[in-house]
Amino acid sequence: MDGSVAKGTSCIQDSQSSSVIANTDATLGRHLARRLVEIGIQDVFSVPGDFNLTLLDHLIAEPRLKNIGCCNELNAGYAADGYARARGVGACVVTFTVGGLSVLNAIAGAYSENLPVICIVGGPNTNDYGTNRILHHTIGLPDFSQELRCFQTVTCYQAVVNNLDDAHEQIDRAISTALKESKPVYISISCNLPAIPHPTFSRDPIPFSLSPRLSNKRGLEAAVDAAVTFLSKAVKPVMIGGPKLRVAKACDAFVELADSSGYAMAVMLQPKGLVAEQHPHFIGTYWGAVGTSYCAEIVESADAYLFAGPIFNDYSSVGYSLLIKKEKSIIVQPDRVVIGNGPAFGCVLMKDFLSELAKKIKKNETAYENYRRIFVPEGTPLKSEPNEPLRVNVLFQHIQKMLSDETAVIAETGDSWFNCQKLKLPEGCGYVTNNSLSAWYPFYLQTLEEKSSCCRYEFQMQYGSIGWSVGATLGYAQSVPKKRVISCIGDGSFQVTAQDVSTMIRCEQKNIIFLINNGGYTIEVEIHDGPYNVIKNWNYTGLVDAIHNGEGNCWTMKVRTEEELTEAIATATGEKKDCLCFIEVIVHKDDTSKELLEWGSRVCSANGRPPNPQ
């Protein structure tokens, strides 16, 4: 046997090589730890509580697994989200109900973004199930299922482990389901079980075997033939990548089609960074009236458009204002293709469809040539006068210069969406597809290291939970320690989750955080203004200095002018390059991107539609 593995089969090692585990290590807690390590998790984000303390003891006993204690459960969940974006899977550990319901919001966000996050909860003692006892950390009822029922709508699998006999099976099924579905799962483990040995944990676990999903061959052929016929009739077809390129692992196939077709290629906002922006036919971000200049004009004037993995919600469609006609569209979802108003082809995987279409499509560069004819390069911000108050567009001009293959960008919900979408990601950018979870794990970390040498861009648009970026920055940076994470966070969002800057310092992270202080919830102001959008101003650098408290490496600076910003960036990337750098950028409360002004008015109109007549 040559040791080769069929393409797409997940396997960690030959199961015949499994060794006997000492009885003291053959516990439920240690088994769970080994399983997490096996799929690529090296860090778990946790908040201790009396129901999960023994479990945490056994997780940290695994030398390959590090516990990252967070300030609250919400941030622990956001950190697992950020970790999963870089590594392909993440995990958090919280306590029963008070911890579970606190982390629930973050798990819902991970579900919306198709991220496999394993949410582990320390549950009640096995002897309390089925009794009439009332426990603390509950709502005062003897029914312990409230937490489980809450998680059922935001996870793809739920396991309640209160019996050792089936614990092995339940844990394995939950983890494998998270990887197969690319969604979060919930695992509750009774607090009196983690330390108990059991025969099912006495050997190294048999490796996960995730059989590859296959396209229906006849359906694939029919879908490709129908698409070729549809596109061959078009004079100026275009192609647009959507956020589900990530979960479909179809980024390479999408670029392959762009190479062979010659079509003008754009991406929607959510998948920015999933494909290289240096591609010769890349025309920018398609986001209707607020996307890259001239991109919407080319896309919406096309007579055929292929969307790969789109999500058309009210935010991505700018208040449902995109000028897209269904009869001109090919919509390719992870396992389904719909051409115009029909036909539809199920059981056809996106990556297979795009790859096969690339082999048969005729080259047509008309749309891209049209783009080249009308394109006018964007101007640069007005030059600042000496000591003039800093403008946001000047800030992002400087952030642009900081980007390299050694950086990643995290954009908070708000005006940072609009400013960061205008950043030009440097050569080598592209999503690190976690195909290694479909291959041999021993090569996983090597593959991750090789492919992570690119500038990445992450944000949460579908769920849009303000404060997400603090925890996500913590998790992302922990997963890829060789990168310097640049986070752009508004003051309102920062006030929601600020505490875990403390955890970044404790973990010796070297992130650069730009705190944009404009005195309120700017994105809400542009949708619907009111006194509730004004927040209490904090001394943000003073707060971070207090959190730092002289322990660890942290440097802060408050900037009000371009000269001060230039000095701060030079220090952060030079003398303080090994520190967590927190730069508070003070700008005018009305200083927003023009795109936010347009987007806000359209979303406001969509939100304000009167009820349909009954």
UniProtKB/Swiss-Prot annotation:
Keywords: Decarboxylase, Lyase, Magnesium, Metal-binding, Thiamine pyrophosphate
Domain of life: Eukaryota
Biological process according to GO: aromatic amino acid family catabolic process to alcohol via Ehrlich pathway
Pfam families, sorted: TPP_enzyme_C, TPP_enzyme_M, TPP_enzyme_N
GO CC aspect terms: cytosol
UniProt KW Thylakoid keyword: no
InterPro entries: DHS-like_NAD/FAD-binding_dom, PDC/IPDC-like, THDP-binding, Thiamin_PyroP_enz_cen_dom, Thiamin_PyroP_enz_TPP-bd_dom, TPP_enzyme_TPP-bd, TPP_PDC_IPDC, TPP_PYR_PDC_IPDC-like
GO molecular function: magnesium ion binding; pyruvate decarboxylase activity; thiamine pyrophosphate binding
Reactions it catalyzes: a 2-oxocarboxylate + H(+) = an aldehyde + CO2
Entry comment describing in which tissues the protein is expressed: Pollen.
Cofactor entry: a metal cation; thiamine diphosphate
Binding-site positions, substrate: D50, H137, E524
Region (Thiamine pyrophosphate binding), start-end ranges: 415-523
Disulfide bonds: none
UniProt binding sites for Mg(2+): D491, N518, G520
Enzyme Commission code(s) on record: 4.1.1.1
Ion transport listed as a keyword: no
Cofactor binding: number and manner: Binds 1 metal ion per subunit. Binds 1 thiamine pyrophosphate per subunit.
The family this protein is said to belong to: Belongs to the TPP enzyme family.
Assembly and oligomerization: Homotetramer.
PANTHER family: PYRUVATE DECARBOXYLASE (PTHR43452), PYRUVATE DECARBOXYLASE 2 (PTHR43452:SF20)
Name of this chain's protein: Pyruvate decarboxylase 2
